[in-house]
A protein has these predicted regions:
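Adenine-nucleotide phosphate-binding core of ATP-dependent small-molecule kinases
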Residues: 28, 34-57, 179-182, 189-239
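Short glycine-rich anion-binding loops that position phosphate/pyrophosphate groups of nucleotides
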Residues: 11, 69-72, 135-137
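Short glycine-aspartate micro-motif
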Residues: 3-7, 61-65, 105, 129-133, ...
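Glycine-rich phosphate-binding loop and adjoining helix at the ATP-binding site
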Residues: 33-34, 38-46, 50, 54, ...
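Acidic/polar active-site rim loop that often engages polyanionic ligands
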Residues: 27-28, 73-78, 167-173
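Short glycine-rich, Thr/Ser-proximal phosphate-binding strand/loop in the N-terminal lobe
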Residues: 2-43, 78-81, 154
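Glycine-rich phosphate-binding loop of actin/hexokinase-like ATP-binding domains
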Residues: 124-183
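A cytosolic small-molecule/anion-sensing beta-strand core signal
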Residues: 19-20, 68, 75, 108, ...
Length: 239
């Protein structure tokens, strides 16, 4: 029996066809295309599922699971709020089912990542564990006494939106000083752009031009080339 797992991120949609023991048989990744709207994102999810299930007998597929950033209703598959996707009360489960025929199980991305680590990963055998996910945003998942800690609204372990500096950098959620506003790829890109504006001679400009945009790699590439300004973009912290 095989299963399909999808990681919906603010930058990429990643999927895998896995066995019952967690062994990966096939992997797929494509851009999320958040800027094109929810329909385009759902089309991308459907394309990933279609590619992963190609050539696999549906009777051999035990199910499809998707991890989504933000607050998710695990029972209905509705995304209550996902700031990095711009979604509020969005019926993701229904949208993907209408495109693929698969009835997905959907949960918060960091929660399901924590569950996977507890079942077959580095936290296997542990009664309690905490996982922090880093990407476009910052997520958190908590396993407490062998059970997922989700809270009444499913947002109990949203570690990325703990305020670590009152009145600090603005977060995509609208608040200021969140962990995510300092430790995510979004924060790194912001700091890289600031460093580039302050240092027009920096090699970060050439690195960004080569990649077609300023992204999470820009400062690291420039630093590897000996750029003096690039390390500051990476090393900045709220302390």
């Amino acid at each position: 029996m095989y299963y399909i797992g999808i990681d919906l991120g603010g930058t990429n949609i990643k999927g895998a066809l896995v066995s019952e023991t967690g062994e990966i048989a096939r992997e797929v990744s494509r851009p999320t295309r958040v800027g094109l709207g929810a329909e385009a994102v759902c089309d991308g999810i459907a394309a990933v599922i279609t590619e992963l299930s190609s050539g696999v007998d549906r009777t051999s597929l035990g199910g499809v699971g998707l991890g989504c950033p933000g607050t998710v209703d695990d029972e209905t598959g509705r995304v209550l709020y996902a700031n990095n996707l711009g979604w509020k009360n969005f019926d993701l489960r229904a949208e993907v089912k209408s495109r693929t025929g698969f009835d997905l199980r959907i949960g918060n991305d960091a929660n399901v990542a924590a569950l996977a680590e507890a079942l077959v990963g580095c936290a296997k055998g542990a009664q309690s564990a905490v996982i922090v996910t880093l990407g476009t945003g910052v997520g958190g998942g908590v396993v407490l006494d062998g059970k997922m800690l989700t809270g009444y609204t499913g947002a109990a372990s949203e570690l990325g939106h703990m305020v670590i500096r009152a009145g600090g950098e603005e977060c995509t959620c609208g608040r200021r000083g969140c962990f995510e506003a300092y430790a995510s790829a979004t924060a790194l890109i912001r700091e890289t752009k600031r460093a580039m504006a302050a240092h027009p001679e920096s090699r970060m400009h050439a690195a960004a031009e080569e990649n077609g945009a300023v992204d999470g790699r820009t400062a690291f590439i420039a630093a590897q080339r000996g750029d003096a300004a690039a390390p500051a973009a990476v090393d900045r912290h709220p302390g």
